[in-house]
């Protein structure tokens, strides 16, 4: 057999890029608090909210969470067999929280592989929630519903760093009933404003159909509860349903999205981009 034929039979190991995740939802439902929580798991605690006029994110902010932090977080999940993922990290895009910034939110939606739609589990859907779903559907972006502020459920007992799946099942029966009531309210709102069925991720992930279903992840960004659940669901969805888009082909022409363009003193015109395909080389 020729060397050429042998080469053709060798499996080429696939290398994945980071999934790009848009973070969107109604103002004050917890987008920035979630991103603060993500940044804090690396030991570098920040509070973006304090640096923003009126507490509203006015530009697209990028947060890169590397794989070592993802592994550390997901290892705390109460699974018998610990899941393994190939992604080198996750890139989160924070989108504006004011309705006048709809065009920028739309830009973020078109960049993303997956989105997380944050909803205050007690308040439910608001106008920007509905707008976000419409944008995500128009761009064919799969999304996860995050039921944030689960600690607002009466007598809910939070524990920082705990899986929200574990926490949900450790609450008293009365508290679980109240949490279920809020969940079923969200389920109805999702059905009213989209074509999708909603399921708690621990009940629906094995039978998940991306054409018809969306997963629900409860959490408390304020109390640091349920972050590992969200990271797990993001990676599980991305590597299963968006895998072809994540595979890096180094010889391909570079493709990506310009997030911002500006003039910098002493440097000149600069652009911030997210590279989604191929490789950028000197001289391109």
Residue ranges and their predicted role:
Residues 17-38, 61, 68-69, 199-284:
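Conserved catalytic-core segments of large NTP-driven translation/proteostasis enzymes
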Residues 102-123, 137-144:
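Inter-motif core of Ras-like GTPase G domains
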């Amino acid at each position: 057999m020729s060397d050429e034929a042998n080469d053709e039979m060798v499996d080429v190991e696939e290398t994945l890029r980071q999934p790009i995740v848009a973070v969107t939802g109604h103002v004050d439902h917890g987008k920035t608090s979630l991103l603060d929580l993500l940044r804090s798991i690396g030991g570098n605690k920040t509070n973006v909210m304090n640096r923003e006029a009126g507490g509203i994110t006015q530009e697209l902010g990028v947060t890169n969470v590397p794989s070592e932090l993802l592994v550390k977080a997901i290892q705390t999940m109460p699974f018998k067999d610990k899941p393994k993922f190939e992604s080198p990290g996750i890139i989160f895009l924070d989108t504006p929280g004011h309705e006048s910034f709809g065009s920028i939110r739309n830009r973020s939606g078109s960049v993303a592989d997956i989105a997380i739609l944050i909803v205050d589990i007690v308040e439910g859907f608001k106008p920007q929630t509905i707008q976000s779903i419409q944008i995500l559907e128009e761009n064919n972006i799969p999304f996860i519903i995050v039921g944030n502020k689960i600690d607002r459920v009466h007598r809910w007992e939070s524990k920082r760093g705990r899986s929200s799946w574990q926490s949900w099942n450790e609450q008293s029966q009365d508290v679980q009933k109240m949490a279920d009531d809020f969940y079923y309210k969200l389920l109805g709102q999702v059905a009213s404003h989209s074509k999708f069925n909603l399921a708690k991720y621990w009940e629906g992930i094995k039978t998940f159909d991306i054409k018809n279903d969306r997963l629900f992840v409860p959490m408390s960004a304020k109390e640091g509860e349920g972050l590992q659940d969200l990271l797990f669901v993001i990676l599980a969805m991305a590597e299963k349903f968006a895998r072809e888009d994540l595979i890096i082909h180094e010889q391909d022409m570079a493709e990506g999205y310009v997030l911002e363009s500006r003039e910098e003193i002493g440097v000149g015109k600069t652009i911030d981009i997210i590279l989604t395909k191929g490789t950028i080389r000197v001289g391109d």
